[in-house]
Amino acid sequence: MRLFQNIWHNMANNKNRKQKRQKPKPDKCAFQVAIENTEEVKDGFCIGKQAIKGNDRNKVNAADNNKLQGSLDIDSQVKALYPNSSRWDYALSYNDKIYFFEIHPAETSEIENVVKKVKWLKCWLKTKATEIDKLPKSEHPYIWVQSGRYAILPTTKEMRKLTMSGITTANKLSLG
């Protein structure tokens, strides 16, 4: 009986020591909470740039990585739900501001496709991702990041469509 009591006592002490050693979980940022409250992407939050696919990660530069709160691969999360839709790629939170960016070939012939994608994104945010939509956005929240060379003629009617849709273009997404 005494042996059993000693074993039980040691197990209880080990459990208490483990609980004391565990690091406290960091507070969740508003972006993470909003994602977790959005049914279609509830498991999609990743710390830092981890949700961004390998080569695409090089297209995002943060001046201060401590302000980079998290990312969401929208396309991968909702692909099964909207297989035939023109889905937007990513959302990212930096310094409590949300950036939505699409990595895509930057050619005049692709403007219509990217405009369709941003229309889909705005509709999805308003109807399915209202918690994410409520978050503060960057000054220019919809960014088309070129995946290769830049071949968009600045004076075309397609370029005006891009501007009217609120999309800005960039070689890289520069944060901060």
Regions of interest found by a model, annotated:
Residues 72-80, 100-101, 105, 132:
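N-terminal low-complexity, charged segments
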